[in-house]
């Protein structure tokens, strides 16, 4: 099985919250797709609570589109990482890490401004596979944490995993 790019970076050196360009690729038609690692937590030291990350998934996707889409950028998908330390965001275009960080911070402000659980989009059994597993309070605590700590940039060249550790 091929080793995925996400496992070629040293998770012990990652900062959080931080944005990282995880991958770029060009489609056959010439569009650039960029995948960003939006790391909310320091790997193996912090973890996002399941209800909070789920609620954040519902809110973050819309808010990031509000703040980042346009001028050659269109978000394809924002999905939580299985390890619950962040999200991957795939988009068409090549925004800078700073543009992504600014949109992320603005989105966290938006999460903090959601008044009650009834305002969470798609929060029903028809549009959500686990619609009862949500917590606006947890999502807002995650957002507050990001706002308090700010968003750094994780650079791939600083996180390259030593070859000797690849299958440790």
Swiss-Prot record:
It holds the Pfam family LuxS. The keyword Lyase applies. It comes from the Bacteria. Keywords: Autoinducer synthesis, Iron, Lyase, Metal-binding, Quorum sensing. Binds 1 Fe cation per subunit. InterPro entries: LuxS_sf, Metalloenz_LuxS/M16, S-ribosylhomocysteinase. Homodimer. This is S-ribosylhomocysteine lyase. It comes from Neisseria meningitidis serogroup C / serotype 2a (strain ATCC 700532 / DSM 15464 / FAM18). The gene is luxS.
């Amino acid at each position: 099985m091929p080793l995925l790019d996400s496992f070629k970076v040293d998770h012990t050196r990652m900062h959080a919250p931080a944005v990282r360009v995880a991958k770029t690729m060009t489609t056959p038609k010439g569009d650039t797709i960029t995948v960003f690692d939006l790391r909310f937590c320091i790997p193996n030291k912090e973890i996002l609570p399941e209800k909070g990350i789920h609620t954040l998934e519902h809110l973050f996707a819309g808010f990031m589109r509000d703040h980042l889409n346009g001028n050659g950028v269109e978000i394809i998908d924002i999905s939580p990482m299985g390890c619950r330390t962040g999200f991957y965001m795939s988009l068409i275009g090549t925004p800078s890490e700073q543009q992504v960080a600014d949109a992320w911070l603005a989105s966290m402000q938006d999460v903090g401004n959601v008044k009650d659980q009834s305002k969470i989009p798609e929060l029903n059994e028809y549009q959500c596979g686990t619609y009862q597993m949500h917590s606006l309070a947890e999502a807002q605590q995650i957002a507050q944490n990001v706002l308090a700590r700010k968003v750094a940039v994780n650079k791939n060249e600083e996180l390259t995993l030593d070859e000797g550790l690849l299958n440790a």
